[in-house]
Design a protein with these regions (language model features):
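Conserved phosphate-donor/acceptor-positioning beta-strand/loop module used by diverse small-molecule
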Residues: 111-131
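Hydrophobic anchor at the beta1->P-loop junction of P-loop NTPases
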Residues: 13
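ATP-dependent small-molecule kinase phosphotransfer cores
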Residues: 42-104
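Walker A/P-loop
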Residues: 22
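ATP-binding Walker
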Residues: 19
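P-loop (Walker A) phosphate-binding loop of NTP-binding proteins
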Residues: 16
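Small-molecule kinase domains that catalyze NTP-dependent phosphoryl transfer to phosphate-bearing small molecules
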Residues: 129-163, 167-174
Length: 174
C-alpha cells in the first residue's frame, strides 16, 4: 500500500458538469510543463450509444438506461482508469478526472483520491452544478480532500490557472 499523499507535485482536477475541467487541465499542464493525463470518458468513446460526446444526449442516456445501471457502468470504468493512473503516474502530472458529478458518492474512488495532495475542485453556478454542489456538501470527505477550490464563473482559463498556482504557493507557505 502506498503512503497517503504520494503525489505531492501532481494536480487532480475535479468538478461538476460544464466547469472547463479539460481546458483548465491543459492550461495548467502547459504553464507548469507537467504531463497531462486525461480520464474524460468521452475521449475514450466509452458509451458506444453515440459517437460524439454531447451533454444533452449524455444525461438522456443515463435516464434511459436507469440511473443505477448507468452509474454502475461508469464506476467500473472510472475505477479502472484511476487505478491505471495511480499505478503508472510519475510525479509532476495534471490529471483531468472527468465528470466527478457521477462518482461523488463512490467510496472506493473517493478513498483513492487521498493519494493526491493537490485536489483542485472547480465549481460554477451553472444549472448542471446545483445537484453536484448539494452532493458535494453531503460528501464531507471529498469536501475535505479538495484543498484548492476555485469558482470559475466569469474567469478565463488563464485566470483560473493562475488562481490554482497561487493557492498552491500560499498552501506551501502555511
Amino acid at each position: 500500500m502506498q503512503d497517503l499523499n504520494v503525489f505531492k507535485n501532481s494536480y487532480l482536477i475535479i468538478g461538476g458538469p460544464n466547469t472547463k475541467k479539460s481546458e483548465v487541465s491543459r492550461g495548467l499542464s502547459k504553464k507548469l510543463n507537467y504531463k497531462l493525463i486525461n480520464l474524460d470518458r468521452e475521449k475514450y468513446n466509452y458509451f458506444n450509444d453515440f459517437t460524439d460526446y454531447d451533454e444533452e444526449k449524455y444525461y438522456k442516456l443515463i435516464e434511459i438506461k436507469g440511473k443505477l445501471k448507468a452509474l454502475n457502468y461508469i464506476h467500473k470504468y472510472e475505477m479502472k482508469h484511476l487505478n491505471y493512473v495511480i499505478d503508472n503516474i510519475n510525479d509532476n502530472s495534471v490529471i483531468d478526472f472527468g465528470n466527478t458529478y457521477l462518482i461523488i458518492d463512490d467510496k472506493n474512488i473517493i478513498n483513492k483520491l487521498e493519494l493526491f495532495d493537490n485536489i483542485v475542485l472547480l465549481v460554477s453556478n451553472n444549472k448542471y452544478n446545483d445537484e453536484f454542489i448539494n452532493k458535494l456538501n453531503r460528501n464531507k470527505l471529498l469536501n475535505e480532500l479538495s484543498n484548492i477550490k476555485v469558482n470559475i464563473d466569469n474567469k478565463n482559463v488563464v485566470n483560473i490557472v493562475d488562481e490554482i498556482i497561487n493557492y498552491k504557493k500560499f498552501k506551501d507557505i502555511l
